[in-house]
Amino acid sequence: MAYDVLIVGGGPGGYVAAIRAAQLGLKTGVVEREHLGGICLNWGCIPTKALLRSAEIYDYAKHASDYGLAIHGELGFDSKALTIRSRKIAAQLNSGVGFLLKKNKVDVIWGEATIVNPGEIRVAPPKKPPVQPQDPIPKGVLGEGSYQATNIII
């Protein structure tokens, strides 16, 4: 399949560049091996901020009397529930990236890219399967194979 632009990596730089290229009328694809949105969205900044927000709420509850409030009973936390909430927030944002790419008619090609010649990428199955929060890859999507592009962005 031939593209005007192929972008290797669906992180914050890759997916934004892909959307803009598509908006400018270029046939665009993104090769992603693991999860759209990159490390920050899926495993770093966003999940960490969700955990910090839970800690902040816990701290407010511990100091409820400072606000003229009373909490009866023991205050505690559930680390599993905190993690589930954090992952859920990341998954929601991850699916938003997928929606934006689809809305802008950007093809997502699942796999690991290798540039084999100028203007040609070979995509192989990822060394490790996609991990949550990425939804399972639907049947019929682009993946393993050879792709040509006028421009390749890494």
What are these regions, as identified by a protein language model?
Residues 1-11:
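Beta1/beta-strand and adjacent pyrophosphate-binding region of the FAD-binding site
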Residues 2-3, 19-26, 31-154:
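Glycine-rich flavin
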Residues 14:
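N-terminal Rossmann-fold NAD(P) dinucleotide-binding loop
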